[in-house]
């Protein structure tokens, strides 16, 4: 069973997350030959203050 775990900075819309799930799932089907019913995708949203970029939080960078 292919499983993708995706970490993203919080703030994406439900539609954007749905698109990520659909496209990542399709990519896993194509790459592994696994049936779509066996594919799992987990999106973990990370608060901006908990995401560091070059030593600074994403919140401080205005992301």
From Swiss-Prot:
Catalytic function, reaction form: (2Z,4E)-2-hydroxyhexa-2,4-dienedioate = (3E)-2-oxohex-3-enedioate
Protein's UniProt keywords contain ATP-binding: no
Keywords carried by this UniProt record: Aromatic hydrocarbons catabolism, Isomerase, Plasmid
Residues of the active site: 2
GTP-binding is among the record's keywords: no
Superkingdom as given in the UniProt entry: Bacteria
MF GO annotations: isomerase activity
InterPro entries hit by this protein: 4-OT, 4-OT-like_dom, Tautomerase/MIF_sf
Pfam family, one: Tautomerase
Enzyme Commission no: 5.3.2.6
Pathway: Aromatic compound metabolism; salicylate degradation
One annotated GO biological process: salicylic acid catabolic process
Family to which this protein belongs: Belongs to the 4-oxalocrotonate tautomerase family.
Assembly and oligomerization: Homohexamer.
The protein's role, per its UniProt record: Catalyzes the ketonization of 2-hydroxymuconate stereoselectively to yield 2-oxo-3-hexenedioate.
Protein name: 2-hydroxymuconate tautomerase
Lineage of the species this protein comes from: Bacteria, Pseudomonadati, Pseudomonadota, Gammaproteobacteria, Pseudomonadales
């Amino acid at each position: 069973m292919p499983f993708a775990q995706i970490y993203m900075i919080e703030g994406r819309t439900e539609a954007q997350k749905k698109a990520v799930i659909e496209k990542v799932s399709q990519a896993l089907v194509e790459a592994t030959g696994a049936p779509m019913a066996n594919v799992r995708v987990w999106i973990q949203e990370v608060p901006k203050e908990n995401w560091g970029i070059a030593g600074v939080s994403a919140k401080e960078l205005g992301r």
